[in-house]
Amino acid sequence: MIEASKLKAGMTFETTDGKLIRVLEASHHKPGKGNTVMRMKLRDVRTGSTFDTTYRPEEKFEQAIIETRPAQYLYQMDDTAYFMDTENYEQYEIPIVNIENELKFILENSEVKIQFYGSEVIGVTIPTTVELVVTDTQPSIKGATVTGSGKPATLETGLVVNVPDFIEVGQKLVINTAEGTYVSRA
């Protein structure tokens, strides 16, 4: 059992009614009057729906034991993404609604880890940084580095990130997958 005050983003727990929930955001909130509460943004792992809720810090939940296996992202069709276990070549289907954030960072044939809750496939874990190529951005303007505000760039997965002014189409960038931000040129 784990207390609500110990839950952090990325953790998965099971509610008393059997729902498998992943924490997207968690923060302590102390109202002017009353007791401290935990404000959380959560996702139902099975349905993909997200919701906001509050819990008392002492509320307890059953922490879900999630196992991972190495896999390769194959392709997506309709509303399903397909992955292959790289050890036993078994293929798995995951509804896109459950992993739409992760799909912004991975290309076909990328290495990931598939998450299992018992024998049920519930999601994927991606690397903390990925290398992606810029497919569209505004041209660099000489002397425009003074402002330092950057410009939007579209990457090969369709993700749009803010990049420095010197970045051009065709360059490979390192992207932080947790925040969806530019780190450096590759």
Swiss-Prot record:
GO terms for cellular component: cytoplasm. The keyword Disulfide bond does not apply. Pathway: Protein biosynthesis; polypeptide chain elongation. Its main location: cytoplasm. Keywords: Cytoplasm, Elongation factor, Protein biosynthesis. GO terms for biological process: peptide biosynthetic process. The keyword Cytoplasm applies. InterPro entries: Elong-fact-P_C, NA-bd_OB-fold, Rib_uL2_dom2, Transl_elong_fac_P/YeiP, Transl_elong_KOW-like, Transl_elong_P/YeiP_cen, Transl_elong_P/YeiP_CS, Transl_elongation_fac_P. Involved in peptide bond synthesis. Stimulates efficient translation and peptide-bond synthesis on native or reconstituted 70S ribosomes in vitro. Probably functions indirectly by altering the affinity of the ribosome for aminoacyl-tRNA, thus increasing their reactivity as acceptors for peptidyl transferase. NCBIfam families: efp, PRK00529.1. This is Elongation factor P. It comes from Streptococcus mutans serotype c (strain ATCC 700610 / UA159). The gene is efp.
